[in-house]
Curated annotation (Swiss-Prot):
It comes from Methanococcus maripaludis (strain C5 / ATCC BAA-1333). The gene is prf1. Gene3D superfamilies: 1.20.5.170, 3.30.1330.30, eRF1 domain 1 (3.30.960.10), eRF1 domain 2 (3.30.420.60). The keyword GTP-binding does not apply. One of its GO terms (cellular component) is cytoplasm. This is Peptide chain release factor subunit 1. Heterodimer of two subunits, one of which binds GTP.
Amino acid sequence: MSGNSSTDMYLFKKSLKELKGKKGKGTELISVYVPAGRRLSDISQYLRQELSQSSNIKSKTTMKNVQSAIEVILQRLKLLKEPLEMGVIIFAGMIPRGGPGTEKMEVYVLEPPEPVKTFVYRCDSLFYTDPLEDFIQDTEVYGVILVDRNEATIGTVKGKTITVLKKLTSGVPGKFKAGGQSARRLERLIDDAAHQFMVRIGEYATESFMPILEEKKLKGLLLGGPGNTKNEFAEKDYLHHELKKKIIDTFDLCYTEEFGIRELLDKASDLLRDLDLMKEKNLIQKFFKELIKDDGGLSAYGEAQVMKYLEMGAIDTLIVTEDIGITRVTVKCNNCDYAQEVNVKTNEMFKFEEQLKTKACPTCGGAMYIDEEKDIIEHLSDLCHMHNTDIIVVSTDTEEGSQISRAFKGMAAILRYKL
């Protein structure tokens, strides 16, 4: 993939969702995964062998469709330039649009976000998309341990997702008023109970984090909690020695459980600037700081305003939410050179197509037709590239991303200069 990573990942996820929804009439949809660095001539030779063997398929319709799909893939391979640093993934096949006879050849060429490792050729009624699921998973994981004398929470932060893996309670009694030997005996019992609680936390942490560490996906551990318990846990040998090496820092917190994890992430933001969650949070907070200024500062929001300023080259950073749901449509006249680009809500495309049938060209009165449909985020990404503007596609899983979606219809921006 090239260009902006958040845009590329959004488009990749969208393509994956579309591919998973495709279904062939029979076992005639072809999926080909070409590994990084693999010679395309080798792949073409393999496909020509499959093309030859497909003549043995009993159903003439299925045979014809399989052969057509293989030939389309062979044609696409000729257009690619070597070496392919990431490899390439190609899907092709006849997809029914309705009843019998409505099948249409569809082909998808994807550049994966990570190198393809294994060659795959598969012919099935569905496109083989399982390996694509692995590509969209965030690989870096932070482990989180929140601890005080009474309770502990073990969790992970992966990309934008916070997962609580285990909640523990200690049963350690609180302070008491007593004297003499009874007090000292009770104090020893409390200390022993606290020690055993720390041991339990360490065991669960090892169980939770060592598999991630062995997969080389554990970027670090963050420890937090009220009081000194967290420091004692970090300094003594409660954690596996390999996990102790991964401790990034400890943080004073008011809370434990999931709210405590969010509090910890706020306090650890300087250390986690590369984490997607922090990138989005900091950028959106910067937008809101501009927005609340008396004159609106360097903020812009809403489809009309943002599109206008973007085409002027006045936007420094564009923020778009994943759920924006808009398609950029190019409408043309079939009689003259008239053309128009409009934004249409994706879930209203059918309605738009029906209305277009009744509209005439404003120039010559000819019939209008849809020439191109493009995801608005892909269109915005192209404009941003033209004007040297940064674009970030944010999730609505976070509070900040959800605010952009609800309050500003999924589109906001930070300007280069005041307009």
